[in-house]
């Protein structure tokens, strides 16, 4: 399978699967569980050709996919992986399977919504690890917080409301600061590519900020 198809499949298969589980609904909770398990296993299976096709002898990004996204902002749908992101992607896909299995009989209410949230979260996390465009990374990062917020707030423990509020405040503040930093780096480099950011001759003071 070509790398261009592979990374996008790893991202959008669990997201699409999550939406399908959501469409199944709680009226067919058993089907929702099985569909979630099948999608999580299929996503994990896609990691096999990714791992086999990865060349560990080079430090450059591999499985590159680069398409226009928001031309007005010089943002691209730019994906790729290196030796750091590869194991994180595999770990994410691997851990989703036991999460689905462990929740099989524990979650009895809003079953479809629960499994949909985890599958969508999986796809968005993989997107975070694949994104080579900072704005695309920011999109995946921010979108990832939505299913996390729902999982904590709906299926969390006794203090889930407090935990959700605290989670929101921390992530909102961090997201604002991250966005400011990305805009600053964009103004310095002229695009949102991670490689462009890495090549910037930033002063020590700028790096500390």
State where each predicted segment sits.
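Short hydrophobic "helix-edge" motifs at membrane interfaces and signal-peptide entry regions
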Residues: 3-5, 16, 71-73, 122-124, ...
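Alpha-helical transmembrane segments of multipass membrane proteins
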Residues: 18-23, 48, 97-101, 123-127, ...
